[in-house]
Structures are given as C-alpha cells and as structure tokens.
A protein has these predicted regions:
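Short glycine/serine-rich loop segments
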Residues: 46, 54-169
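Short, well-ordered alpha-helical
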Residues: 1-42, 46-47, 52, 67-72
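Acyltransferase
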Residues: 199-216, 241-247, 268-289
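Short, well-ordered beta-strand elements within core beta-sheets of diverse protein domains
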Residues: 37-41, 153-160, 260-263
C-alpha cells in the first residue's frame, strides 16, 4: 500500500502512533520520502514531539511515507511509491503527509503525526476522509523536524475523531487543553472560489444542521497564497538545493526545486510584508468569530 516507510516498536503505551518520515526518531534514518537521503546518518536523538509522545502512554509503530521531501500536495511519490488512498483508491491521497493520512483511513494507528507548511496536513486529511489539524505556528515544537528551518511549517495530528485529535494535541503540546464553551461558537465562511459540487455539499450540510453562517472576505487572500509559495520555495531550496545534484530526486520535485532556486531574497522580504498584512486581517476576523470555515479541496 506504500503507506508505511519503516516499521518499528518504540515505547509500550496503549496509544499506537505512526509519524511522518520527516520527523527524527533516534536510531533511524530520516529519509523524507527520498532516495537522495537513503544514505543519511541515523538520528542521534528523538525529535521533541517523539519525546512528548513517549512520555504520554504512546507506542510508535512506524514511520509513514510522504510526497518526496514534503514538497508537494498530491502525495504522489515517484521515488518510493505513492500511498494508496484507502477510502478512495482511484484518487490521490493528498500531500505531503500522504502516508500519515492514509494510515488513519486504513485504521493502522490511533493517531498519526504529519507536518503542514502550506496544506500538508489539511489536504491529505480532506482527500482521505479523516480529521487533520494544523496547529498555530510555533505551538508544537519543530526540534528534530525536517527541514530544520521553516517559518511556516507545523507538526499536526491525524485521527478518525475530533476527540482523538484533542488527545494527540494534549500529548504533543503540554499547554493544550480542549476549550469549554457553553454558547454556540460564532462561525463564518471565507469567501473563496470552489467547485460547485463542493459549495453545494457544504451548503447542504449547513442546511441540515440549521446553521446560517455569514460570508466574509479577505482582501489579501490571493496575494497571501503567492507570498506563501515564495517563502516555501526559498526555504526548500535552501534546505534541499544540494540534493538536486545527486540525480536521485523524482522528476516532479527536482523540477520544483530547480524552479524554486530562482526565488530571490527581495521577493521573500516582500512576501513577509504580505504575510503580516494577511495575519492582521485574520486576527481581526478572529476577534469577532471563533473560527473561519474554508474549503480544503476546491
């Protein structure tokens, strides 16, 4: 099924966990779904999230496959094989945390961990029909997570229920606690373009739930996407550019990395300004609403 990159048995807790193979586990190589890293040294210490899991009644049973170098949203891995989408075998699993999402859809673990820079937890969760969460940036430790330097990447869980997502978050972030709220949450829908089938499905659900939500606009939405991609491209080239010389990277990721090499520091600085404007808009909306609904797959 190409879901599992490597099996293991670490810890003896009651919760079974699989983690994306871009997270260090002591004594194992972190290959990030790429043949170009097959000869890398084994990790000398556990990533901080692994330490947290082992301190909270968990057993780590496997590393999961991913879109090569976590640089893609389809989950297709031309180097090591693409994880099958258990619920929809004819469709892509989504990426980059494809194996982590597919493992949950196949009921191979209680929860799994992935990483999300520009949708890499949210996309595969949507594609595989499971729950996935990208926490607030900086909330969950990235120590021991690859690439080492990222200004957008987050570690986040996948599970088959919201309750298990909450449990996973309590394990990987000691400060996390489920919010208690007596009143109904104030929600709004972000106005983004989407396929009519997606729009109709959401409206159908809201109607059945007897919910009428306001629609809100974000002026910097499209420019924020472009800015995010510039930052991601620049940082991935810094992290993995040297690997393009090995001849061992799949054609799709090789092409994306070589294109990313053209991203300049001037572009990144401008992108950071857009990021700040976008963050300001979102923060203002979250002063009024508890959550904003946005389609993951449009």
């Amino acid at each position: 099924m190409n879901i599992i990159a490597e099996k293991m048995q670490i810890g003896s807790g009651k919760f079974t966990v699989m983690v994306k193979d871009s997270i260090d586990i002591q004594g194992y190589k972190t290959k990030s779904g790429s043949r170009s890293l097959e000869n890398s040294a084994v990790a000398q210490v556990h990533a901080q999230v692994i330490k947290n899991l082992l301190a909270h009644d968990c057993t780590i049973t496997a590393k999961t496959n991913l879109h090569e170098l976590a640089f893609g949203i389809t989950g297709i891995n031309h180097a090591l094989g693409t994880p099958i989408n258990p619920k929809y075998p004819e469709l892509i699993p989504g990426g980059s945390s494809s194996g982590s999402a597919a493992a949950i859809a196949a009921h191979l673990a209680d929860f799994t961990l992935g990483t999300d820079t520009g949708g890499s937890v949210r996309m595969p969760a949507a594609c595989c029909g499971v729950y996935g969460l990208k926490p607030t940036f900086g909330r969950v430790s990235r120590k021991g997570v690859h690439p080492e330097h990222s200004s957008l990447d987050c570690v986040g869980p996948f599970a088959n229920s919201v309750e298990m997502i909450e449990t996973a978050m309590q394990f990987i972030d000691p400060s996390f606690h489920a919010m208690t709220q007596d009143d109904l949450p104030q929600l709004a829908i972000l106005n983004v373009q989407a396929d009519v089938v997606v729009q109709d499905t959401i409206q159908d659900f809201l109607k059945k739930a007897q919910m009428q939500l306001p629609t809100v606009d974000i002026k910097t939405f499209n420019s924020a996407y472009d800015a995010g991609m510039q930052i991601i491209n620049y940082e991935n080239w810094q992290a993995y550019g040297e690997l393009t010389k090995t001849g061992l990277i799949g054609a799709d990721v090789q092409g994306r990395l070589l294109k990313a090499a053209d991203t300049t520091l001037v572009q990144v600085k401008q992108a950071e300004k857009v990021k700040a404007q976008f963050t300001q808009e979102i923060d203002a909306l979250l002063e009024k609403y508890d959550a904003l609904d946005r389609k993951s797959v449009v």
